[in-house]
Amino acid sequence: MDDLASAETLDAVSDETPNSARLFADASTVIPGGVNSPVRAFAAVGGVPRFVRSGAGCWLTDVDDNRYVDLVCSWGPLILGHAHPAVVEAVQRAAKDGLSYGAPVEGEIELAREIIDRVQPVEKVRLVNSGTEATMSAVRLARGFTGRPKIVKFAGCYHGHADALLADAGSGLATFGLPSSPGVTGASAADTIVLPYNDIGAVAQVFAEQGDHIAAVITEAAAGNMGTVAPGPDFNAGLRRITENHGALLIMDEVMTGFRVSRSGWYGIDQVAGDLVTFGKVMSGGMPAAAFGGRADIMDRLAPLGPVYQAGTLSGNPVAVAAGLASLRAADAKAYETLDRNADALIALLTASLDAEGVAHHIGRAGNMFSVFFGTEPVRDFQSAKATETWRYPAFFHGLLSRGVYPPASAFETWFVSTALDDEAFDRIADALPAAARAAAAAEEN
């Protein structure tokens, strides 16, 4: 049994989760760390991850029959909540006809058109299977289109686990305190330039020095993997100006923000168009699917039209396409109003409870995405995010989880709401928060 599933950790599990403890111990004998994505291991907060039996609306039920208000939403995709009838029906209908063909299906065209209709600068779309594939492919395409080798990214922004993009990344790397990953060679990272987020001056300087060698800047349209950190008022627009002036491309990573913060994603908020845009999460309807798209002249460099190769056996999978299309079509204007209203209400409850206990904090927010930063200083980049009082978060997390509220298991992850949050859910949250806030106030730095 490895460190993540140590006897000490298992002993910390309450009597209410024996089945999760048993399954986690069992999983750790056949799956590294007992999980298939690191943040699920609860390593940053302690305890044993809850093994989920089912989800319905805004509620999760674990294998011990405990119910939780879900404020993770599968890390973002489930804006409509779990098992939304329209999505389930679409998946069942598609699955009845066949699970995979390795051939084109009509639904691919419909999903691509839905994305293009929502994000007007996107003229063509290629479907893939994950956000990592989308960003990895967009970077390769940018290099192939420009003939240049270097990519600029920002510290704390996570663009999937492709080697070239793991330098100083957020998400799990931030959670585990890793600057990069063993196995990423110097050659893989040599053409990646990492700059501070929200520092347009640093971008201007590096382009002045190396602009002829830079293929693209890739940025999260609004950062959600160092906690939630919105771009400064002129940051994205500044990136647009600088890349245009130097003949480089701007890759907007909307895997997290796309179709969540508005019908058109972050583009619908700041109107800054990427030459290439990556999508995932919401457009998948909860299935393994993602996409990247952009200007037609760039996208047409992809095989089979052009020389930049990208392929995938399961890309455009008919069941995943059906789920994504149903999810997007159900996400109408009313849905986005509900998401914003639910985020407002939840943030108000969080703020009131923490204020009542005198816990210094800031809410980082980008549309209806947000996170809680403990401490007195505002957060605008990865350095300031790492300087917060993250040691308060485990106590706060377990104060909520033990009372039936499921927040993200890391201080560096974003909280997500769904349209399915109801009065019962908000009552549960309101009841749980005072004790969780007291736990955060009483926490001591190790």
From Swiss-Prot:
First and last residue of the signal peptide: none
Keywords, sorted A to Z: Cytoplasm, Isomerase, Porphyrin biosynthesis, Pyridoxal phosphate
Entry's EC annotation: 5.4.3.8
Gene Ontology MF, one: pyridoxal phosphate binding
Biological process terms in GO annotation: protoporphyrinogen IX biosynthetic process
Entry's localization field: Cytoplasm
Cofactor: pyridoxal 5'-phosphate
Catalyzed reaction equations: (S)-4-amino-5-oxopentanoate = 5-aminolevulinate
Residue numbers of N6-(pyridoxal phosphate)lysine PTMs: K281
Recorded metabolic or biological pathway in which this protein acts: Porphyrin-containing compound metabolism; protoporphyrin-IX biosynthesis; 5-aminolevulinate from L-glutamyl-tRNA(Glu): step 2/2
GO cellular component labels: cytoplasm
Top-level EC class as recorded in UniProt: isomerase
Family recorded in the similarity comment: Belongs to the class-III pyridoxal-phosphate-dependent aminotransferase family. HemL subfamily.
Oligomer status and interactors: Homodimer.
UniProt name for this protein: Glutamate-1-semialdehyde 2,1-aminomutase
Organism phylogeny: Bacteria, Bacillati, Actinomycetota, Actinomycetes, Mycobacteriales
